[in-house]
Amino acid sequence: MVRTKTWTLKKHFVGYPTNSDFELKTAELPPLKNGEVLLEALFLTVDPYMRVAAKRLKEGDTMMGQQVAKVVESKNVALPKGTIVLASPGWTTHSISDGKDLEKLLTEWPDTIPLSLALGTVGMPGLTAYFGLLEICGVKGGETVMVNAAAGAVGSVVGQIAKLKGCKVVGAVGSDEKVAYLQKLGFDVVFNYKTVESLEETLKKASPDGYDCYFDNVGGEFSNTVIGQMKKFGRIAICGAISTYNRTGPLPPGPPPEIVIYQELRMEAFVVYRWQGDARQKALKDLLKWVLEGKIQYKEYIIEGFENMPAAFMGMLKGDNLGKTIVKA
């Protein structure tokens, strides 16, 4: 019998999550049935969306999330022992699957890049950047792109794809270390929003003519300020609103309607799972190709030990990470 460890939601979050909101449970898994496989987690991800999605869980449920896992026992001929897959059993060390919900890594995945990248730049965060920028914003060469949370798993890829497409890129981050990192990646202007005297003036100085595309990961008052500087027919891809996820008070008001109307702005929220099939496969192959060619750089914030899942999650929400937060089981 195999014993699995699982992090569950002990009680719903109020404000920032705390250690007492989670509970680690241990259980024995049953023997495999025909067609099933036993998975062992290698790498697990924590992402901002989990803060909001946890509201839909019942207390006692397993925390949701993807992992890169290895088939350690198999009764499924299509998934022999040793196969590496993407799975979504949540925060758990071992799980049983019939294989229908599993995804093999790209066949061209080389040994030269870590498997954990399938949870980051060549995974859901990279796809989010890809489709949000190219499909929702539809950026073209010569345009100016603004992205916040720009050193995170999504934002850093947004900026690099925008540079590949010939855009000017302005990024906002929360530390001087992150500023230096994005400058190395080739962002045209990067600033620490926590230390500037005026966000409005900083944005104006970075791009006096305004912004064609705004890739929004933050929401709140920050976004209202950016939206006030959008060019005519500007496009806004609403990916996340991490500044509001842990609020206990009322949400801030939205952007001034007159700006949205008279600038004829297009605002569209999106979830990456809209794109499936061939579109998704092409995007993954593009991302992998750009990584292998050195056109997209990546940084991972690796935390060792499954027992540290809650700490990794809470740290990510507070911006402790530079790059994609990954837990190595």
From Swiss-Prot:
Binding-site residues, NADP(+): 152-155, 178, 193, 217, 239-245, 270-272, 321
Q: Which InterPro entries match?
A: ADH-like_C, ADH_N_2, GroES-like_sf, MDR_fam, NAD(P)-bd_dom_sf, PKS_ER, PTGR1
| Catalyses which reaction(s) | 13,14-dihydro-15-oxo-prostaglandin E1 + NADP(+) = 15-oxoprostaglandin E1 + NADPH + H(+); 13,14-dihydro-15-oxo-prostaglandin E2 + NADP(+) = 15-oxoprostaglandin E2 + NADPH + H(+); 13,14-dihydro-15-oxo-prostaglandin F1alpha + NADP(+) = 15-oxoprostaglandin F1alpha + NADPH + H(+); 13,14-dihydro-15-oxo-PGF2alpha + NADP(+) = 15-oxoprostaglandin F2alpha + NADPH + H(+)
Kindly state one GO CC term assigned in the UniProt record. Answer: extracellular exosome
N6-(2-hydroxyisobutyryl)lysine PTM positions: K178
Q: Which residues carry this modification: Phosphoserine?
A: S20
Record keywords: Acetylation, Cytoplasm, Fatty acid metabolism, Hydroxylation, Lipid metabolism, NADP, Oxidoreductase, Phosphoprotein, Prostaglandin metabolism
Determine if Lipid metabolism is one of this entry's keywords: yes
Q: A Pfam family this protein belongs to?
A: ADH_N_2
Where is the protein found, in the record's own terms?
Answer: Cytoplasm
Phosphothreonine: residues bearing it: T18
Keyword Cytoplasm on entry? yes
Q: Which GO terms describe its molecular function?
A: 13-lipoxin reductase activity; 15-oxoprostaglandin 13-oxidase [NAD(P)+] activity; 2-alkenal reductase (NADPH) activity; leukotriene B4 12-hydroxy dehydrogenase activity
Q: Which domain of life is it from?
A: Eukaryota
Q: What is its EC number?
A: 1.3.1.48, 1.3.1.74
In the record, biological process GO terms are:
leukotriene B4 metabolic process; leukotriene metabolic process; lipoxin A4 metabolic process; prostaglandin metabolic process
Could you say which tissues express the protein in this record? High expression in the kidney, liver, and intestine but not in leukocytes.
Family note: Belongs to the NADP-dependent oxidoreductase L4BD family.
Q: What is this protein called?
A: Prostaglandin reductase 1
**Could you tell me which species this protein originates from?**
Homo sapiens
Q: Name the lineage.
A: Eukaryota, Metazoa, Chordata, Craniata, Vertebrata
Q: Which gene encodes it?
A: PTGR1
